[in-house]
Amino acid sequence: YNAISAILRGYGDSRRPMYFVAMSCLLNIAGDIIFVKYLGLGVAGTALATVLSQSISMICSIVYLNRKKFIFTFTLKNLRIDRDRLKELAMVGIPISSQECMVRLSFLYLTSVTNRLGVNAAAAVGIASKYDVFAMLPATSIASALAAITAQNYGAGKPERARRSLTAGIGFAVLASSVFFLWAQLSPQTMIGLFNTNPDIIEAGIPFFQSCSFDYLAVSFVFCLNGFMNGRSKTVFTMVSCCFGALALRMPLIWLAYTYCPDNLFVIGLIAPAVSGFMAVYTMLFVIRQLRQDNSGRRKELTLRSV
């Protein structure tokens, strides 16, 4: 299901994966209604609806691509493990998976810490985490697109297009995330009020929203830069960077803030953007260094050709 969408995106087609995912979502909703509401299957019905919807979407996508004569044919005979390709995928995929795990781990630690600060603080941080998903969605999506675009253009010998895509991607991600950032700065109480109207929770959450919302802008740089580096197969760097940010910076700083400023949610919320900003700076420096090496290598190649 996800592999077919990834293949299509790598091929430069992001529209058809969207159609397949939309089909899965609609089938999932219909399945939830049928299995839970009418058949009374409860949680098992929800799980069944998810599995069936994704399976049907996968089968339909395979049939569609085979009929459209895609670049290769999906058959049972072709579904086998190629050791060389598996090694290449593992070298790229495992570091990317590891960096995602580290990011989730640091957010889980933040949740566990804020749960000890009382009901109001825990509720406010929980509401903020819901907005985080939507506020960071543009950066996450653009980072995935940048990885594919960068790989395609470097493979085609057009690095300049990849660099322009990076600049455009960062600009678009920052612009899209700015909507949530400005909302959190100008009217955080309305953001919290959409989920909970308790005045104590709103009061506790306002300083946290105003500080943590800076992370929406910072991660736009980090995610896009990491996507660019992933497209160049520099996945080990992005993995080490994310592990360092989560284990050496974010989690220890959260512990320090909890230990010495337990009642100050503004300080706790400021940790994420501070760490992301620092990561953005050294990642940007690494990218600039890589680009300079590319230019130097290209100049040497042109010099050798002219001799």
Where are these predicted regions, by residue range?
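Short alpha-helical transmembrane segments in multi-pass integral membrane proteins
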Residues: 27-30, 38-94, 150-215, 257-307
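Helix-terminus/linker motif at the lipid-water interface of multi-pass membrane proteins
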Residues: 34-41, 101-129, 134, 152-153, ...
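Short runs within selected transmembrane alpha-helices of multi-pass transporters and secretion channels
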Residues: 1-9, 17-25, 46-59, 140-143, ...
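Transmembrane helical elements of multi-pass membrane transporters/channels
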Residues: 24, 53-57, 61, 65, ...
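Small-residue-rich hydrophobic transmembrane alpha-helices
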Residues: 1-17, 124-182, 186-188, 219-241
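Alpha-helical transmembrane segments of multipass membrane proteins
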Residues: 3-7, 26-34, 62, 108, ...
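Membrane-helix interface segments
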Residues: 14-16, 42-43, 120-121, 235-236, ...
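Hydrophobic alpha-helical transmembrane segments in multi-pass membrane proteins
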Residues: 24-25, 58, 96-104, 108, ...
